[in-house]
UniProtKB/Swiss-Prot annotation:
This is Small archaeal modifier protein 2. It comes from Haloferax volcanii (strain ATCC 29605 / DSM 3757 / JCM 8879 / NBRC 14742 / NCIMB 2012 / VKM B-1768 / DS2) (Halobacterium volcanii). The modification Glycyl adenylate is found at G66. NCBIfam families: SAMP2. GO terms for molecular function: nucleotide binding; protein tag activity. The lineage of its organism: Archaea, Methanobacteriati, Methanobacteriota, Stenosarchaea group, Halobacteria. The keyword NAD does not apply. The modification 1-thioglycine is found at G66.
Length: 66
């Protein structure tokens, strides 16, 4: 399954995920840590260990270096 991952304020990527892939897998695929982001589906946060069931997500970075 291909999923569009939009990192808010940054870039949007297409990520291939296995049928049993989780939202944490998506986050790692765009070189982020699941501990520094929240994944949003239809504007609502989802658990990182939940299986991916949609084809588009937004990723909100909670920690940003500076």
């Amino acid at each position: 399954m291909n999923v569009t991952v939009e990192v808010v304020g940054e870039e949007t990527s297409e990520v291939a995920v296995d049928d049993d892939g989780t939202y944490a897998d998506l986050v790692r695929a765009v070189d982020l840590s699941p501990h520094e982001v929240t994944v949003l589906v239809d504007g609502r946060p989802v658990p990182e260990d939940q299986s991916v069931e949609v084809d588009r997500v937004k990723v909100l970075r909670l920690i940003k270096g500076g």
